[in-house]
Amino acid sequence: MRGGMAITAALVVVAAAAESRWAELGREITYDGRALVVSGARRMFFSGDMHYARSTPEMWPKLIAKAKNGGLDVIQTYVFWNVHEPIQGQYNFEGRYDLVKFIREIQAQGLYVSLRIGPFVEAEWKYGGFPFWLHDVPSITFRSDNEPFKQHMQNFVTKIVTMMKHEGLYYPQGGPIIISQIENEYQMIEPAFGASGPRYVRWAAAMAVGLQTGVPWMMCKQNDAPDPVINTCNGLICGETFVGPNSPNKPALWTENWTSRSNGQNNSAFSYPIYGNDTKLRAPEDIAFAVALFIARKKGSFVSYYMYHGGTNFGRFAASYVTTSYYDGAPLDEYDFKCVAFLVNFDQHNTPKVEFRNISLELAPKSISVLSDCRNVVFETAKVNAQHGSRTANAVQSLNDINNWKAFIEPVPQDLSKSTYTGNQLFEQLTTTKDETDYLWYIVSYKNRASDGNQIAHLYVKSLAHILHAFVNNEYVGSVHGSHDGPRNIVLNTHMSLKEGDNTISLLSVMVGSPDSGAYMERRTFGIQTVGIQQGQQPMHLLNNDLWGYQVGLFGEKDSIYTQEGTNSVRWMDINNLIYHPLTWYKTTFSTPPGNDAVTLNLTSMGKGEVWVNGESIGRYWVSFKAPSGQPSQSLYHIPRGFLTPKDNLLVLVEEMGGDPLQITVNTMSVTTVCGNVDEFSVPPLQSRGKVPKVRIWCQGGNRISSIEFASYGNPVGDCRSFRIGSCHAESSESVVKQSCIGRRGCSIPVMAAKFGGDPCPGIQKSLLVVADCR
């Protein structure tokens, strides 16, 4: 205990010394029990998470500008160790991994940065952000009071902090970084490490503070974060679940306000997109309620929407079963909460009338009304004036010309003597592949004697990988796959025909991402565990200890046949008479669609594999794994325009399960339908106080409003997804809206009776619902 107190005291001394030095420079950031204090002024911050490695440098300026226009003050990002140090001691800060360039772009647009260094990040990211070489460090135990781990963690954190200092990116230096994070959600696994857990927390905090960045440090979901490190909340409803700061001198910060929720029974669970599942986005009203409650109940002063821009898990960086498309949450406008009264109604069904300081108010179900100066309602969470838009994928190029496609059938390894490794045991997969490929071949020879009787046998394989494909004597015999929420092991039990004499069994074990969380992650095992053959009534013959050969990766991967140079290293065939079957590479070319709309591939006709454009992997696909809705978890795959050339773009896919490439289309994405729904008692934005509520709609990408699909001033039924005229309707609704909007990029229509020629139904609360098309 005394040792822990000494460390805490040392932290405070170091932090105080740093604050004194930075204060002399005229720029200082500290905190008190209410908020972060920037150059002497308390600030309330609204932040959005945006990961530089999940987009491209060409996209960053526009994404950041949209975040700023959406009302954000701060962009929050993780730092991904495994992209920056993929090989020990060899660093990469180029292209989409140029962290400094990303932060400078944020600064150029006048926003602040929350830098989550981790270096464990989870983030549904490969190996939780750790480089796999860390797994092979002798005697290492991740995220514990373990000297090998602490040394490597300190080296990387110091590398990042030193880089930020050298570039002058911390706020006291004139930069945008106002806060940093060390570790991430460690409390969830801390008990697994016993006494080592708290010691590690104290060490991590001391190490971070000792780097003297001049800005506060925080730990997410870490109630025992030592002073001066701030403990923060991650979750859906931090206004209800957060225990609060562990010191009266620390502010309440919400570092992850999740913008999607679980489809299951646990309403407070985070739901990120995984293969085989549907994802449920949160309604803006629900997010607004949660934010207002956090501010009212916990005195919150920092909220970050996770995610504000989701982006793409390029290449193989998605964690286990996580889709290539990382989700986008709906951003909310910023509201200047200089309010002193929050009236909360937790009832989800009733609208009570309340008296507050001689003011009579109705509180909508599950809502919070924010009163400025305890008198004027400036914000109601049940009435979020957010525009809704519907994205449309427009097929602009069909890749259905059979003459433009070529195929290469991936060879199934048959010869043990040509294996990468051999051994009389079943190897663990990630240790063998170093997580540099999803694929590991297990090859064994089985001698079948005539005396064994029936040539039809059963092949039994149990595996801790995610997918298994089995071949016997070069013939495909079956596959099996798991799921994110299912049992860890998968089992293949299938018939096979054996010939007399030697038979070659080739098993392709496939990982769909590596783990990203959990205690003792370095000890997790994957790959095939048991292989057996049963013939007739004979006992199962286990092959676990036979001589096995191993081939790491696919042949096409080794030769990089997805690149312009590598594509010439194999003999491609026409697909005129090709019967689609597992493990086939396909290639073609396509032209870049004109314009600036986002470009995607529609891979609905395919099965499972990976796709490259001009040598750049745009990620794994798995459209054959349907969600409960019956639809693929993801069918459209984003191609950043920065990956493209004007024409002759090389498209290469490796298909594991079959699929028809002739049905693939190149699409552009655009918001073709926009909608606004505001009632006459909605609170206008603070900057418009005193004015009447308005429906505001606008088209993106230079498009203009071409038609009005629906307009009703009265009591329209439904919302932006489903709507019809109600019992009260102004006949002039459509003509008024058309006159205000047609041919324009955007328009605003006051929600007031005079605009529509008078009150169509006195005594009834009215709203205006408008649905418009953009072209």
UniProtKB/Swiss-Prot annotation:
The catalytic site is made up of 185, 256
State the family it belongs to. Answer: Belongs to the glycosyl hydrolase 35 family.
Supply the source organism's classification.
Answer: Eukaryota, Viridiplantae, Streptophyta, Embryophyta, Tracheophyta
The Enzyme Commission number assigned here is: 3.2.1.23
Main enzyme class: hydrolase
Q: Which GO terms describe its biological process?
A: galactose catabolic process; plant-type cell wall modification
**GO terms of molecular function:** beta-galactosidase activity; carbohydrate binding
Q: From which residue to which does the signal peptide run?
A: 1-17
Subcellular location field? Secreted, Extracellular space, Apoplast
Source organism per entry reads: Oryza sativa subsp. japonica (Rice)
Q: Which PROSITE patterns did the record assign? A: GLYCOSYL_HYDROL_F35 (PS01182), SUEL_LECTIN (PS50228)
Read off the InterPro entries from this record.
Answer: BetaGal_gal-bd (IPR048913), Galactose-bd-like_sf (IPR008979), GHD (IPR041392), Gly_Hdrlase_35_cat (IPR031330), Glyco_hydro_35_CS (IPR019801), Glycoside_Hdrlase_35 (IPR001944), Glycoside_hydrolase_SF (IPR017853), Lectin_gal-bd_dom (IPR000922)
One cellular component (GO) term of this entry: plant-type cell wall
Protein name from the UniProt record = Beta-galactosidase 7
Q: Which SUPFAM superfamilies match?
A: (Trans)glycosidases, Galactose-binding domain-like
* UniProt keywords, alphabetically: Apoplast, Glycoprotein, Glycosidase, Hydrolase, Secreted, Signal
The record's principal subcellular location, in a coarse class, is secreted
**Annotated CDD domains:** Gal_Rha_Lectin_BGal
Reactions that this protein is recorded to catalyse: Hydrolysis of terminal non-reducing beta-D-galactose residues in beta-D-galactosides
Glycosylated positions are: 257, 266, 277, 358, 602
Where does the SUEL-type lectin domain start and stop, copy by copy?
689-775
